[in-house]
């Protein structure tokens, strides 16, 4: 397994693979890898001749009061996981390599970023789409793999790739959970013992919503009330948003008549966690 830090060096390797007509699976990450990332890597390994993982904590997708400086980093642990699951190359550029000068060009995806995390984290998806455009141009992958836990990100990236004619297939992979139901996340590392226990309220509230939907509740406000009521019973939980949107357009719905995404963002102490599920009628 190679670990490469420069665009020049990684492009030389990519060119060699492309000259040999090898397919490339790409897993973009910010590092501090866990079983959720491992599931993406395994899927990429099954479907491609070569697998690349990028590890880059992207400064332009963080807001001024967010956790860029404290985001967990552990390249040794990450490298071990990548090697275990058969990654061929880790691309781990410095910030100065990706952004050597002040950046004036940005990628925006409208409409799909109006709600959910796009509303609550202004500029976040502009940063995500801009850095992914750079990575797609640098690495030229055949397929790229994203977790469904970041459901809005997955929808936004799919639309960007479609609109800008990137010759890349975007693959969504299911949420990976702890045994007790908490969605795997690098930010779970921030939680102390009590917060970790309290964080289970996210999955529990979504399960109650799913039960109501399966009992044919069609009013989205009633579903949201169920989630909010459950979350408010946890003293350490502070709701950022509870949203029910069309699973394709990500626009809010009142009456549930088509597939929906039920998505929540909740602060447990100072840690912001997200979770979701898709419900198909």
From Swiss-Prot:
Biological process terms in GO annotation: pantothenate biosynthetic process
SUPFAM superfamilies xref list: Nucleotidylyl transferase (SSF52374)
The entry's keywords: ATP-binding, Cytoplasm, Ligase, Nucleotide-binding, Pantothenate biosynthesis
Subcellular location: Cytoplasm
Catalytic residues (positions): 37 (proton donor)
Subunit-structure text: Homodimer.
Protein name in the entry: Pantothenate synthetase
Natural source organism: Clostridium botulinum (strain Kyoto / Type A2)
Lineage, top ranks: Bacteria, Bacillati, Bacillota, Clostridia, Eubacteriales
């Amino acid at each position: 397994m190679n670990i490469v830090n420069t665009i020049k060096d990684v492009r030389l390797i990519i060119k060699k693979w492309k000259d040999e007509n090898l397919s490339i699976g790409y897993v973009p990450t910010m590092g501090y890898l866990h079983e959720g990332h491992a599931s993406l890597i395994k899927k990429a390994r099954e479907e491609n001749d070569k697998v690349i993982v990028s590890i880059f904590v992207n400064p332009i997708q963080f807001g001024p009061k967010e956790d860029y400086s404290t985001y967990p980093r552990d390249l040794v642990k990450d490298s071990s996981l990548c090697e275990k699951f058969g990654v061929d190359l880790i691309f781990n550029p410095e910030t100065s390599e990706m952004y050597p000068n002040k950046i004036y060009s940005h990628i925006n995806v409208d409409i799909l970023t109006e709600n959910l995390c796009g509303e609550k984290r202004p500029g976040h998806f502009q940063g995500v789409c801009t850095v992914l455009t750079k990575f797609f141009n640098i690495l030229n992958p055949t397929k790229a793999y994203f977790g469904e836990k970041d459901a809005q990100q997955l929808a936004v990236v799919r639309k960007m790739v479609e609109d800008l004619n990137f010759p890349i297939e975007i693959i969504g992979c299911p949420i990976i959970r702890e045994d007790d139901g908490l969605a795997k996340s690098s930010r779970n590392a921030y939680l102390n013992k009590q917060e970790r226990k309290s964080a289970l309220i996210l999955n529990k509230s979504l399960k109650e919503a799913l039960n109501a939907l399966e009992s044919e509740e069609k009013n989205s406000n009633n579903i949201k009330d169920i989630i909010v009521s459950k979350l408010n019973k946890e003293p350490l939980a502070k709701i950022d948003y509870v949203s029910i949107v069309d699973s394709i357009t990500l626009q809010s719905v009142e009456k549930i008549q088509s597939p929906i995404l039920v998505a929540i963002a909740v602060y447990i102490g100072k840690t912001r966690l997200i979770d979701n599920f898709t419900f198909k009628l």
